[in-house]
Regions:
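Bacterial N-terminal signal peptides
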Residues: 7-15
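Noncatalytic, solvent-exposed loop/strand surfaces
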Residues: 18-433
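Bacterial N-terminal signal peptides that target proteins for export
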Residues: 1-7
Length: 433
């Protein structure tokens, strides 16, 4: 009887864990930060009238993706001129706005490129607290039950040059954010309880971008990046994966100590979130000459320059690399033994994740900034013109559905239960059978 009871308790606990993961979408790209969901029963087809439970207009201009915890949805927004930065909470069941709270006034906003907005970083959420950042203009933690601001920071200086894009992530007692500006480049961990700085680590790459007068080329534009960190367990240890301009870094997330890095100086302006599977780190390298790389993680202290031959005996290496159809803004998605990506111009590709062999490439049409979602054997690709193309994730290309909503997507999808939450440029939609 005791063994049976323990087994039953264990099964209930595992079932509850699965349900929690299905219901909560706690950060950019979901519970694992890789755009995959364990949910089943998501709709295949929809329109403005079919399989729509509700839709709610969202004021301002913002590309942040929604996060979900329990019965709440949180997202950020900003006025078009960037002078007012706000956070919103919606009721998941009804779509009604619970809180619409202006957090920061900005007297002199930095420039934001048309591909960007003044509220592009997505929040991070856990039980009782939500964390939002707008980059240098401000970072804050709010109580999700009262909407009260628990702490905020406005003292972090960084010239985002074309706008901030790096979303915060949670790990243990830390909130971790990339700051890759034209003037300074670093990764920073906040104590999530107090907002105080736990550690700060400057990027270590020599950009080699000084002209003959010692001035930084292009006003530091090539030092910019917009990526979001990822936590991976590598050889039994937690590793913080952080893509900066011209280099992929691995850090100890507890201390910020750099473990290894891969340098690629021919590219710049990367905006993807790295992922880890099959013992490999997958990332792309941004504008100019973008690569999709599968990196074999290295030992502490190892450095690899992609343009040079790896030192003999070094563990850190490029397992495979391609320049074909590599996205600059949308992040790749690993599903089983396959990796999928759509480039900014609408060509989707599938490769074998372990070898880089191309399985298929097909034009979906439109332009893409949102990262794909993988769930229940399908991939959902949302473009800037408002179309979502659904294809199988088994390695055989077929357009299962093509759905359209007005105004287009810059934000990536979120999932809770059997519902899709899609943020267009003007509204948030709950799509459900």
């Amino acid at each position: 009887m005791k063994i049976s009871s323990l087994l039953l308790i264990g099964l209930v606990a595992l079932s509850s864990l699965g349900r929690a993961e299905d219901l909560n979408w706690p950060e950019f790209r979901g519970p694992r930060g890789d755009g995959t969901s364990t949910s089943t029963g998501l709709p295949l087809k929809w329109s403005t009238t079919e399989n729509v439970k509700w839709h709610m207009p969202i004021h301002g201009r913002a590309w942040s993706s929604p996060v979900i915890w329990g019965d709440q949805i949180w997202l950020t927004t900003a006025t078009e001129d960037g002078r007012e930065l706000s956070v919103l909470c919606l009721d998941k069941e009804s779509g009604k706005i619970v809180w619409d709270k202006k957090l920061f006034d900005v007297e002199k906003p930095q420039f934001a490129h048309k591909f960007n907005s003044y509220a592009s970083p997505s929040p991070a959420i856990e039980d009782g607290r939500v964390y939002v950042t707008f980059g240098s203009p401000g970072t804050a933690c709010l109580d999700t039950k009262t909407g009260e601001v628990l702490w905020q920071r406005r003292d972090i200086k960084c010239n985002h040059y074309r706008g901030a894009g790096s979303s915060p992530i949670l790990w243990k007692n830390l909130l971790i954010v990339n700051y890759d500006g034209s003037d300074v480049q670093f990764v920073m961990a906040f104590d999530k309880q107090t907002g105080k700085t736990a550690w700060k680590t400057n990027r270590s790459i020599d950009f080699r971008d000084l002209d003959k007068n010692g001035k930084v080329e292009a006003e530091g534009d090539f030092r910019k990046a917009y990526s979001t960190c990822q936590i991976a367990e590598i050889e039994g240890q937690p590793v913080l994966l952080s893509q900066g301009a011209k280099a992929m870094y691995a850090y100890n997330p507890a201390t910020g100590e750099e473990l290894w890095r891969v340098e690629e100086r021919s590219t710049q302006g990367v905006g993807v979130r790295p992922s880890y599977a099959h013992g490999l780190v997958y990332t792309t390298t941004g504008w100019t000459r973008s690569h999709l790389m599968a990196i074999r993680p290295g030992k502490k202290g190892e450095v690899l320059d992609v343009a040079e031959k790896a030192p003999e005996g070094q563990q850190l290496k490029i397992e495979w690399m391609t320049t074909r159809g590599t996205p600059k803004k949308p992040s790749p998605t690993v599903v089983g033994d396959l990796i999928f990506a759509v480039d900014d111009g609408g060509v989707a590709r599938c490769w074998k994740a372990k070898t880089g062999d191309e399985v298929w490439n097909e034009r979906l049409g439109g332009n893409f900034s949102a990262s794909p979602l993988a769930a229940a054997g399908r991939l959902y690709f949302c473009n800037e013109e408002g179309k979502t193309v659904v294809v199988p994730s088994d390695g055989k290309f077929e357009k299962l559905a093509e759905n359209e909503l007005p105004d287009g997507f810059m934000a990536s999808p979120a999932v809770s239960g059997k519902a899709l939450f899609l943020r267009t440029k003007t509204e948030l939609w709950r799509i459900e059978k």
